Design a protein with these regions (language model features):
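Acidic/histidine-rich, metal-coordinating catalytic segments
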Residues: 2-3, 82-94, 117, 122
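Extended, low-complexity cationic-aromatic segments
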Residues: 1-73, 172, 176-177
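C-terminal anion-handling pockets and recognition modules
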Residues: 125-178
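A generic "structured core" feature
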Residues: 75, 111-112, 152
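Short, aromatic/basic amphipathic alpha-helical patches
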Residues: 96-106
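RNase H-like polynucleotidyl transferase catalytic core
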Residues: 24-31, 107-123, 140
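Short, solvent-exposed loop/turn segments at secondary-structure junctions
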Residues: 9, 94-95
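Generic structural signal for small/hydrophobic residues in well-ordered secondary structure
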Residues: 3, 40-42, 72, 89, ...
Length: 178
C-alpha cells in the first residue's frame, strides 16, 4: 500500500489541555508554505506477514512522475526477488509516462489502483495520520531541514513499532496473514 504525504512547516493544530486563562499558542516563524513530500509504502511479505515502512524524502517539492518512478526503483531494490504488487491511488504521477516505463522494464512489478476517494482503504494513509496529526501536531518547525529530520524521526519510530504498523494495515481493513 503506497501513498504520498506532505509535511508542512505550518503545524497541524489539535486540541490540547491547558489551565483556564492560559491558552496555548503555537508560534510559527514562517508564512512560507514549504513542505517535505514523502512517498511511502507499508509493505507486506505475504508468506511471513512481515511489515515494513519504506519512505523517500523530497524537500520543497511535489511528488511528480520522476519521484514516483524513483520510489518504484526503491521498492524494487528493497524486494529484489519475486513479484511485487503495489497498490496506490490515482494520482496523476502514478500514471505518468516515466512510471509506465519503469513498469514495462520490470515485469515482476504490477501496479493496482485504489478507487477514487478511498483513502480509508490505504494503510499508508493511517501512517501519515499518525505522524502528521498526532506525533507532529502543535509543533512548529522553523526550517526545511528540521522539518525533514522531524518527519523522518517520527516515521522511523512508527516503522520500528511493528504492532503499530500492523494496526495501520488492519485499520484499512486488510489482513496481514493468508
Amino acid at each position: 500500500m503506497a501513498d504520498e504525504a506532505g509535511f508542512l512547516m505550518s503545524p497541524s493544530v489539535k486540541k490540547t489541555w491547558a489551565p483556564r486563562g492560559d491558552t496555548p499558542v503555537v508560534r510559527c516563524r514562517t508564512r512560507r508554505h514549504k513542505k517535505v513530500s514523502v512517498p511511502g509504502a507499508v509493505a507486506l511479505r505475504p508468506a511471513t506477514g512481515e511489515l515494513a515502512l519504506l519512505c523517500d524524502f523530497h524537500p520543497d517539492s511535489y511528488v511528480r512522475g520522476e519521484q514516483a518512478a524513483a520510489f518504484l526503483h526503491r521498492v524494487l531494490a528493497e524486494y529484489p526477488a519475486g513479484p511485487v504488487d503495489l497498490v496506490w491511488d490515482n494520482l496523476a504521477a502514478h500514471r505518468s509516462p516515466i512510471v509506465k516505463e519503469v513498469v514495462a522494464a520490470h515485469p515482476r512489478l504490477t501496479l493496482h489502483y485504489l478507487p477514487p476517494y478511498a483513502p480509508d482503504l490505504n494503510a499508508a494513509e493511517w501512517v501519515w495520520c499518525l505522524a502528521k496529526h498526532h506525533r507532529m501536531a502543535n509543533h512548529a518547525i522553523d526550517d526545511l531541514d528540521g522539518l525533514q529530520a522531524e518527519a523522518k524521526k517520527h516515521l522511523d519510530d512508527i516503522a520500528a513499532d511493528h504492532d503499530l504498523l500492523r494496526s495501520c494495515f488492519k485499520g484499512a481493513g486488510l489482513a496481514t496473514a493468508l
